[in-house]
Amino acid sequence: MTAQINLKDITVQFGPNKAVNNVNLEINKGDIYGVIGFSGAGKSTLVRTINLLQYPSAGSVEVNGTILFKEGKLQVSKKQLQEKRRKIGMIFQNFNLLNEETVIENVAFALQHTHLSDKELEEKSLHLLELVGLKDKSDFYPAQLSGGQRQRVAIARALANDPDILISDEATSALDPKTTNQILDLLYDLNKKLGLTIVLITHEMDAVKRVANKIAVMEKGKVIEKGDLREVFLHPQKQLTRQFVGGALQAQHILNTYNFDKLADNAELYQLVYSINDVTKSVVADLDVSLNTKASILYGNVEVLSGEPIGTLAILLNLDEQKQKEAIKFLESKNVVVTKLDKGVLTND
């Protein structure tokens, strides 16, 4: 599949500092691609190279099959760039609404460059407000709306030019948890209804887990880990990724305090991660029956990834080496991802 967005060898440098350092990122049509990292990681700077609100110091930017920037130069005319930008909507933490204009006037403002009649402007603006669930608030002013409602207006305005890409730059970070989830669910629905590709910039793993199918983790200007959300979630390679994954791998944090020196010679700790949709019965109970053993459950948790419940268990098995191998083989036959837990797994980067 040809990527809809292809960022190749992107570097953005401010003086001696590289805010983005040689990053490669491919985003396919229809993806909800989460770009996550702490403040200062470079995620907003990177994503702003997509619509060239930020020119790279090096690297190339290709969107929808058109190379926009390469070898330090713009590859399209200024007019062409403006047209391309209109097909890339953007929403921010600050809603950037016009306080003296009504909700419908705020949406229509994004269409002022068009040749639509007043009636057509009104019809399209109302349609966009209906998409975001605010048609009944068309004559309200921003000050009369809640934070979540104002962000919905911003989303409607970002969709005014029928973009096929929407960049969400920390758009939910100023909202309370309930409203955040409502906005994320709206973005997810728009992705499905409109085939909209969404680039979700955030420092909150819960936001990525709720709606994204892909993820890139950034640290100090570099993408340190990327790929399918489920794969990265189940097999985080870097310490920062493990930190963001958090809840589902809370077992690792708990087991950091475990006294491994006191384990019996044959005892081993394992982390089991599996889709609850794939498991109809208790895998541990099945294991006990199959191998005539008794696994001790030290930890259990359930996370939800884009609507898919993922279970995590930490178990202790006291078996000889051959039985340990049989246990792992049995669990893997049940679509369980098995990771042996020791101090190296728990603490090493």
Swiss-Prot record:
Q: Does the keyword Mitochondrion apply?
A: no
Q: How does it sit in the membrane?
A: Peripheral membrane protein
Residues binding ATP, per UniProt: 37-44
The UniProt catalytic activity note for this protein reads: L-methionine(out) + ATP + H2O = L-methionine(in) + ADP + phosphate + H(+); D-methionine(out) + ATP + H2O = D-methionine(in) + ADP + phosphate + H(+)
A GO molecular function term, named singly, is: ATP hydrolysis activity
Name one cellular component (GO) term.
Answer: plasma membrane
Q: Where would one find coiled-coil regions in this protein?
A: none
* Enzyme Commission code: 7.4.2.11
Instruction: Look at the named UniProt entry and state the broad enzyme category this protein falls under.
Output: translocase
Q: Where does the UniProt annotation locate this protein?
A: Cell membrane
Return the similarity comment.
Answer: Belongs to the ABC transporter superfamily. Methionine importer (TC 3.A.1.24) family.
Q: How does it assemble?
A: The complex is composed of two ATP-binding proteins (MetN), two transmembrane proteins (MetI) and a solute-binding protein (MetQ).
Could you tell me what this protein does? Answer: Part of the ABC transporter complex MetNIQ involved in methionine import. Responsible for energy coupling to the transport system.
Q: Tell me which PANTHER family the record gives.
A: AMINO ACID IMPORT ATP-BINDING PROTEIN (PTHR43166), METHIONINE IMPORT ATP-BINDING PROTEIN METN (PTHR43166:SF30)
Q: What is this protein called?
A: Methionine import ATP-binding protein MetN
